[in-house]
Amino acid sequence: MLLLLALVSVALAHASEEHFDGNRVYRVSVHGEDHVNLIQELANTKEIDFWKPDSATQVKPLTTVDFHVKAEDVADVENFLEENEVHYEVLISNVRNALESQFDSHTRASGHSYTKYNKWETIEAWIQQVATDNPDLVTQSVIGTTFEGRNMYVLKIGKTRPNKPAIFIDCGFHAREWISPAFCQWFVREAVRTYNQEIHMKQLLDELDFYVLPVVNIDGYVYTWTKDRMWRKTRSTMAGSSCLGVRPNRNFNAGWCEVGASRSPCSETYCGPAPESEKETKALADFIRNNLSTIKAYLTIHSYSQMMLYPYSYDYKLPENYEELNALVKGAAKELATLHGTKYTYGPGATTIYPAAGGSDDWSYDQGIKYSFTFELRDTGFFGFLLPESQIRQTCEETMLAVKYIANYVREHLY
């Protein structure tokens, strides 16, 4: 079957109402509380899209802050920083150019590709196809629907056997983190492709099941392709507010809305009106609750920062098995680096990246899943959320090593 080809520029014309031409992404060095106050002042006077950390309230001394500024505010922001002697560098000088550079060719096939970013419709068709093509290893089920009525699919990967221990992996919590769903697709492909070729994969799939949720926030993901590439929240409506969406990784009942989250519907860190208020988070949580007897590990895949995190993020307390979790991610990070030399940092969420309540990894850990981790994939900020397709293969290859390392440890340390 011949694949239809379309110009990337045409696709991009439909991908966003905001063209981002002239927009910039900055990295600011925060030395002390005076700099923290200046960043918060800037956020109060200009429309700042924080990339890392998630909001002005999470800025702290002796860190760096990455944020995205609209073209009309660039001059004012740079003048403000210079007048206050705040050091900054421009990570992306024109966001529009970076958007176009995500795609590694001027033409793209309409079919599915593991080394391209795929639209939701393409991913959905792939889900059906991969289950049809691999009936001995893959089954698909619908665990719920999104706010806009799209089916949420989970793929169960493993050799059929009753009551097998399982590992749950989800991708695409935040809509603009396109590399995340790309990894879930890659994981499924490699699992079925290497089952009869690699003894370690065969052992994993014979002894464990893997539940893979390729895209959690489907509505938001679709919106990044059709309207606004920088969207991150869900697309639900709120009574009494014109602002849409909830930050899904602030919507779980784990220190809900206590820190690193907002009760304002217009905030990018809005925690929602209640825990699990979002159809997407409720469906995910219900599935895990219904399978708690078998799920032994939980991995949620995000970007960016090159980090492996474990609980807690909503509190500075350490988990009971802190030493075990730290040793495990240390080994996984070392394994990941063997392929392309990519360096990951690791540790508890609150101290390693920033405090944030309502996360799915903290929630799953508190449900009794003692191997619960968040991956923050490539890169460390040069491309940020706009990682080029040319890096998909390497990112997924190295992440696969880390995930298999953790999975094998879980297989050997069942509880």
UniProtKB/Swiss-Prot annotation:
Upper lineage: Eukaryota, Metazoa, Chordata, Craniata, Vertebrata
UniProt-annotated catalytic positions: E376 (proton donor/acceptor)
GO biological process: proteolysis
The encoding gene: Cpb1
Propeptide residue span(s): 14-108
Disulfide pairings: C171-C184, C243-C266, C257-C271
Enzyme class: hydrolase
Residues engaged in binding substrate: H174, A175, R176, E177, R232, N249, R250, S303, Y304, Y354
Cofactor(s), names only, from the UniProt record: Zn(2+)
Annotated protein name in UniProt: Carboxypeptidase B
Binding positions for Zn(2+) per the UniProt entry: H174, E177, H302
Localization terms from the record: Secreted; Zymogen granule lumen
Highest taxon of the lineage: Eukaryota
Entry-linked SMART domains: Zn_pept
InterPro entries per record: CPB_M14_CPD, M14A-like_propep, M14A_act_pep, Peptidase_M14
GO cellular component: cytoplasmic vesicle; extracellular space
A Pfam family assignment: Peptidase_M14
